Amino acid sequence: MAHTDFSTGLQSASEIEITVTGRRSGRSLSYPVWFALDGDKLYLLPVRGSDTEWYKNLRKTPTIRLAARGKTFTTSARLLTDEEQVGEVVEKFRDKYGAGQVKAYYPKPDVAVEVPLA
């Protein structure tokens, strides 16, 4: 699917579905997640940080499929571990969802994921 079609599906979405490949099973595994957009990049924060299962799966196989409002897009994820970069992603989430929500749902923001949409 074209990037512009998928981006249109993101405009009014507060949550998307990601699909990753299981590191042990090799099966496709899907999860609902919050996201933040910045230009042609989409950012994800794993709820339990680096202990989150879907994040561990991306470490082995960085291919990720995103789905929003009936539109899908498949690309490679970039894992962010630099404290400053992760902090910038946390700020994007605070701007979108509110500081209280981010604090409640993301107690261990030690990693983030960058997904190029172009």
Model segments located where?
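Short beta-strand segments
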Residues: 13-47, 64
